[in-house]
């Protein structure tokens, strides 16, 4: 387990009041009075992954009956980019080939959410999920593809709404065997054809 930390809500509230003052707003005006508290509550949720070791969700597993791939496709995803503390939102596709153990599908959802709920980079998030499935679970291989819109690209900087960033991480047998990797990627791409 990672070192326990907890979100300091009162400190966030004070910081948000200071930000409001710094941008020339009145934190006491109607509409903003409760904003510091709301932001602190939102951050407690958005960064709740800092208080856990997401890989711990893989500790409860079951004997595998096959070595066929397991794929969760189109898993909704939201995280906060660590560069600007703006969201990136999209979907994750997560696959693994069991060795001796499998996990419940909801555990994979919790794994992704645990890594997503922290200041994050999409590239790192993709690798962390793939590594946990490969190393912690001890799978034969894993593939993780994340497609997300980075709001820092949408709202500032390049200002290109709708741009999707795609990252992938491939581990183990799925990295070594082009045929198996292609099979997984074809299954993932079916979601794009569904519309």
Regions picked out by a protein language model, each given a short descriptive name:
Residues 1-195:
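A domain-level signal for the structural core that forms small-molecule/cofactor-binding pockets
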């Amino acid at each position: 387990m990672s070192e326990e930390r907890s979100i300091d809500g009162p400190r966030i509230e004070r910081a948000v009041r200071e930000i409001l003052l710094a941008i020339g707003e009145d934190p006491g005006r109607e509409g903003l009075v409760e904003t510091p508290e709301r932001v602190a509550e939102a951050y407690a949720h958005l960064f709740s992954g800092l208080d856990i070791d997401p890989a711990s969700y893989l500790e409860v597993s079951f004997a595998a009956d096959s070595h066929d791939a397991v794929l969760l496709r189109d898993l909704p995803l939201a995280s906060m980019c660590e560069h600007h503390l703006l969201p990136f939102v999209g979907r994750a596709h997560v696959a693994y080939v069991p060795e001796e153990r499998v996990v419940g599908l909801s555990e994979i959802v919790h794994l992704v959410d645990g890594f997503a709920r922290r200041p994050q980079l999409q590239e790192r998030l993709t690798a962390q999920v793939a590594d946990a499935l490969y190393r912690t679970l001890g799978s034969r291989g894993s593939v993780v593809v994340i497609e997300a819109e980075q709001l820092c690209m949408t709202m500032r900087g390049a200002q290109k709404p709708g741009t999707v960033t795609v990252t992938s991480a491939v581990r183990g047998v799925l990295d070594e065997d082009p045929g198996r990797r292609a099979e997984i990627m074809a299954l993932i791409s079916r979601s794009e054809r569904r519309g």
